[in-house]
Every structure is written in structure tokens, then in C-alpha cells.
Amino acid sequence: MKIENDNSQLTIEMPKRTALDREDFLVNARNKSAVEFIDNFYKEPIKRGILIGPKGCGKTHLVNVLCKSLEGINWSFLSSENRDIYNIFNANDVLIIEDINNFNSKQKEDFLFHSINLSKELSKALLLTSSLKVSKLNFKTLDLVSRLEAMNTAFIEEPDDTLMEALIIKLFNDRQLLVKPNTVNFLMQRIERSYLGVSEIIELIDKVSLSQKKSVSIKLIKALID
């Protein structure tokens, strides 16, 4: 730990700690249905679904919440690099495949198609995540598309102002940075209304603040984005 002190504010440099527990996820109308989807995922009769939302919206966070809730239940992440997925399915009750929007080859489509079929054949839970809706995925395998369209889906929408403010504060807190309310308000008026946009600007502010040994302030932010 390293402590820096200028004339206006004491700042403490500490490693970034991303809060990924259930209570750390910021819930409002833009993502409430997705949170309920995850909370109830393993309780549903048909345990197959897709969590859809823009980059940086917290899909991995919610997947982490699900995994932590599965006490005594075997689960595993799957990737298209796995060679023996049949044995992986047999050894686990819940399988997770993230970022299917990045599947851009026939080999990866075949892997996903086979995984969906195995989840049905072996009665295993299967959770997929994607930053694009199924209709926007450029898959060539029509049978795969039809299977995806038949799955339960939950959506996370881009943040409104209330969620934006809470997200900014959380991301600063993850980095152990204390920021005044007027600084948060100033930042909100000047950045892209997206999860990824918020994450990227907070990352930049953090790096500049540390490199210049300055506290996060309106003056520092203004120099970066105005």
C-alpha cells in the first residue's frame, strides 16, 4: 500500500478489488429481469438459457453469482477449445459458455450446437452469454439459430442515469478512490451512456490519477475529456 497526500485530499493507492458478490451487483429496472433470471436459473424445470447484454454490463458478474450459489452442485465453464465435452457434461450439472457472440467459425458453431444437444440429451443445465441478441448473431447453421431462439433469454439494457451514477461510484470504490459527488455529476454529463464507456473512462482516470499522483477531481477529468 502506498499513501499519497497533496493539499486537497488524502489518497491511498491500493490494488484494484473488483466486487463480484451478489450484493455488489447494482440492480435497477435496466437489469432486474436478468438478476431474477440468474437467481431462479437452477430452480426452473428447463435449465437452459441465454443472458444477453452489452459489453461491460455485468454478465460475468452474474455468472459468478450463479456459480457461488451452486453449493454441492458441480459446474464448469466450456470453451470451443475443449476436446472431450461429453465427459465434461457427464461430470457436471451446470455448464457455462460465455461470449457466444465471438463464435465466428463453423468449428465454433458446431461446438455450440453439440453442447446444446448434449444438455438436452443428458438433462444438464446450460447457460450461455452474449453481447448480441440471437437475431444479430451471424451464425450460418440454421438449426443452431432455431435452438438458440427456443431458449429462455434475459436482457440487460444500457444504463439509465440512476444506474450510471451508481456504477461510476462502484467502479471508483473498486479502485479505492474517493470521489466527491460534484465530481461524479460532472463526469456523468460528459461520458457515453454505456457500461463499456463508463468502465473505460474510469480506468483511464485511475491510471492518470496514479501516474500524476493527483486525486480525482473535476480539474483532472476536464483535462482528460473536455
Which residues does each predicted region cover?
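A short, basic N-terminal segment
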Residues: 1-40, 210-226
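Walker A/P-loop nucleotide-binding motif
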Residues: 46-63
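Post-Walker A helix-loop "phosphate-sensing" segment adjacent to the P-loop in P-loop NTPases
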Residues: 68-78
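Conserved nucleotide-sensing/catalytic segment adjacent to the nucleotide-binding pocket
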Residues: 88-129
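Conserved AAA+ ATPase "SRH/arginine-finger" region at the nucleotide-binding site
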Residues: 136, 140, 151-163
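Conserved AAA+ ATPase "sensor/coupling" helix adjacent to the nucleotide-binding pocket
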Residues: 165-177
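Short conserved motifs of the RecA-like P-loop NTPase core
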Residues: 178-191
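The conserved phosphate-sensing helix
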Residues: 191-205
